Amino acid sequence: MSQSNRELVVDFLSYKLSQKGYSWSQFSDVEENRTEAPEGTESEMETPSAINGNPSWHLADSPAVNGATGHSSSLDAREVIPMAAVKQALREAGDEFELRYRRAFSDLTSQLHITPGTAYQSFEQVVNELFRDGVNWGRIVAFFSFGGALCVESVDKEMQVLVSRIAAWMATYLNDHLEPWIQENGGWDTFVELYGNNAAAESRKGQERFNRWFLTGMTVAGVVLLGSLFSRK
């Protein structure tokens, strides 16, 4: 699963960089040996501790937060959703999340004070806070959006070397700490079922399903994420 998770990370970061006029190919070969794992081998992917600092990830004991429960039963008889659909759903959900918190994301520069020496610490602290009370799909979207914003900020500040590092940190965290919850809650198929086909934006417009899952996922994630950003000095 490590390669497919990394593929999701790279696709999302590529998309976010392209929105700002940057190309992933400009940065993908920078310190490539730090982020690329030989195909089919998760254990050989370099961990964040070997890049910049020691990880101290912590998650709540219970994975069910804010109404996030398993959906696997509704998907038992369904074919596996193509990776392309997962990528598209992540892109759309990320866009919707950032639209709702546009002002806060535009303030990342002054809040994080990124440098090559402190980027990992900033990433670690925000992600720890984001998942402190557990995992849900909205917080996973926030996780991807934060990583994308961090990459764009790094490039804007001419610290392109951080892009490949951030991709590695995200892939490692996704594999080690989010993958178990994802599998217990129906896998990425469930994510596409909830967030695919621009569901977040459509729900916001129609309000029919918006209060049921978006407010208990994305909005809570936004509050947690932005709270962790703005509490930093």
Curated annotation (Swiss-Prot):
Family as reported in the entry's similarity comment: Belongs to the Bcl-2 family.
Q: Where is this motif: BH4?
A: 4-24
A GO biological process of this protein is: ectopic germ cell programmed cell death
Instruction: State the residue spans of region: Disordered.
Output: 28-71
**What does the UniProt record say this protein does?**
Potent inhibitor of cell death. Inhibits activation of caspases. Appears to regulate cell death by blocking the voltage-dependent anion channel (VDAC) by binding to it and preventing the release of the caspase activator, CYC1, from the mitochondrial membrane. Also acts as a regulator of G2 checkpoint and progression to cytokinesis during mitosis. Isoform Bcl-X(L) also regulates presynaptic plasticity, including neurotransmitter release and recovery, number of axonal mitochondria as well as size and number of synaptic vesicle clusters. During synaptic stimulation, increases ATP availability from mitochondria through regulation of mitochondrial membrane ATP synthase F(1)F(0) activity and regulates endocytic vesicle retrieval in hippocampal neurons through association with DMN1L and stimulation of its GTPase activity in synaptic vesicles.
Which organism encodes this protein? Answer: Homo sapiens
Q: Altering residue 156 to A: what's the impact? A: No effect on caspase-1 cleavage
Which PANTHER family does the annotation name?
BCL-2 RELATED, BCL-2-LIKE PROTEIN 1
PTMs per UniProt: Proteolytically cleaved by caspases during apoptosis. The cleaved protein, lacking the BH4 motif, has pro-apoptotic activity. Phosphorylated on Ser-62 by CDK1. This phosphorylation is partial in normal mitotic cells, but complete in G2-arrested cells upon DNA-damage, thus promoting subsequent apoptosis probably by triggering caspases-mediated proteolysis. Phosphorylated by PLK3, leading to regulate the G2 checkpoint and progression to cytokinesis during mitosis. Phosphorylation at Ser-49 appears during the S phase and G2, disappears rapidly in early mitosis during prometaphase, metaphase and early anaphase, and re-appears during telophase and cytokinesis.
Positions occupied by motif BH3 = 86-100
| Entry protein name | Bcl-2-like protein 1
Residues at site: Cleavage?
61-62
Per the entry's comment, what about the domains? The BH4 motif is required for anti-apoptotic activity. The BH1 and BH2 motifs are required for both heterodimerization with other Bcl-2 family members and for repression of cell death. The loop between motifs BH4 and BH3 is required for the interaction with NLRP1.
Q: In which tissues is it expressed?
A: Bcl-X(S) is expressed at high levels in cells that undergo a high rate of turnover, such as developing lymphocytes. In contrast, Bcl-X(L) is found in tissues containing long-lived postmitotic cells, such as adult brain.
Top-rank taxon, per record: Eukaryota
PROSITE patterns linked? BCL2_FAMILY, BH1, BH2, BH3, BH4_1, BH4_2
Q: Which residues carry this modification: Phosphoserine?
A: 49, 62
Any single GO molecular-function term of the entry would be: channel activity
Record note on what altering residue 49 to A does: Less stable at G2 checkpoint after DNA damage
Record's subunit section: Homodimer. Interacts with BCL2L11. Interacts with BAD. Interacts with PGAM5. Interacts with HEBP2. Interacts with p53/TP53 and BBC3; interaction with BBC3 disrupts the interaction with p53/TP53. Interacts with ATP5F1A and ATP5F1B; the interactions mediate the association of isoform Bcl-X(L) with the mitochondrial membrane ATP synthase F(1)F(0) ATP synthase. Interacts with VDAC1. Interacts with BCL2L11 (via BH3). Interacts with RNF183. Interacts with GIMAP3/IAN4 and GIMAP5/IAN5.
Transmembrane segments in this chain: where?
210-226
